[in-house]
Design a protein with these regions (language model features):
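A short, N-terminal "cap"/entry segment at the start of jelly-roll beta-barrel domains
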Residues: 1-34, 98-100, 104-156, 241-275
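Conserved short histidine dyad/triad with adjacent acidic residue
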Residues: 21-26, 36-53, 147-148, 160-175, ...
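A short hydrophobic beta-strand segment most commonly corresponding to one strand
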Residues: 39, 83, 97-113, 207, ...
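Short, conserved beta-strand element in jelly-roll/cupin
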Residues: 39-42, 52-68, 161-165, 174-191, ...
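Short acidic-glycine-tyrosine-enriched beta hairpin
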Residues: 72-87, 195-211
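Asparagine-centered strand-capping/turn motif at beta-strand->loop junctions
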Residues: 92-96, 216-220
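Surface-exposed interaction/gating patches
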Residues: 135-177, 185-188
Length: 275
């Protein structure tokens, strides 16, 4: 069965001066070490060493606030997702009080990318607000890629942002070959998980194992937005009988209506080679 973690109910643990963390995903609650996920909260000017083990890489997403990584000249804010290379050494310093940082790590990353030794050794930040917005062919959802092999240099994980306008529903489906999680950024929805309904709200995490049938209905008045990450990045998507495969069409714009930083053509979910 999928696992729902409500961050509002997870204990905050102090791990430094002005820094607390909440363990959202770990082997303790998922039974899996494909991906570990922590939500870290900082006071203004507080810093935390984010050094990774030699066999581990990961990524960061600022949920609220802003900050910087030591030796990296790019300021980090909620518009970016930053790839942390294998064995990264460095610290994050918050620029505002209440900065929240979503940090995911993939231990023993060679399990998911046999060419892990060839992955980029430098930090990489994807400004998702400049990435192309893709429109679902059969409903009102939109998608923005946040992490792909093209963007990060590895196929060990893949990330995207999905937006559901009010009243939007996607068909039931499951994935084969990867586990994945959704972190809700905004809004509420009804999730249909293995035939049972559950409510998801901002701050919740849904962890899906392989073969878990799931779908979402935004039955609220506001937009429902989540980010989802697959480990490994490549997997097969199987749609429920009678459902149309989820295909995505280019809109020719980024989330602000500007020309996007690159072009992505029509494709079906699960066939994202080269994206």
């Amino acid at each position: 069965m999928p696992i729902i973690v409500r961050s509002a109910e997870v204990e905050n643990q102090a791990i430094g001066t002005g820094v607390t963390t909440q363990s959202l995903l770990s082997p303790k609650n998922t039974g899996s070490d494909n991906v570990l996920l922590d939500l870290i909260t900082f006071g203004n000017g507080a810093a935390l060493d984010l050094t990774l083990k030699a066999d581990t890489f990961g990524w960061l997403q600022v949920v609220d606030g802003s900050g910087s990584l030591a030796g990296y000249d790019l300021h980090l804010d909620p518009d970016g997702v930053t790839y942390l290379p294998l064995g990264y050494v460095g610290a994050f310093t918050a620029a505002t009080d209440g900065t929240r940082l979503l940090m995911a790590t993939v231990p023993d990353a060679v399990r998911f990318d046999s060419d892990v030794a060839e992955t980029p050794s430098e930090l990489r930040t994807t400004d998702w607000s400049r990435e192309p917005v893709l429109q679902s062919e059969h409903d009102e959802r939109t998608r923005i890629y946040m992490a792909t092999r093209t963007l990060t240099g590895t196929s060990a994980y893949r990330g995207e942002m999905i937006r559901y306008p009010s009243g939007t529903q996607a068909p039931a489906h499951h994935h084969e070959g990867a586990e994945h999680f959704q972190y809700v950024l905004k809004g509420n929805c009804t999730a249909l998980l293995a035939g049972k309904t559950s409510q998801l709200s901002a701050g919740d995490v849904l962890y899906n194992y392989e073969m878990e049938v799931h779908s979402f209905l935004n039955d609220s008045d506001d937009e429902f937005i989540f980010v989802e990450f697959f480990v490994p990045g490549g997997c097969k998507t199987v749609w429920a009988p009678g459902a149309s495969p989820c295909a995505w069409l280019p809109t020719g714009a980024d989330i602000m209506g500007r020309p996007p930083s690159r072009d992505i053509g029509y494709h079906v979910h699960g066939e994202e080679k080269g994206i």
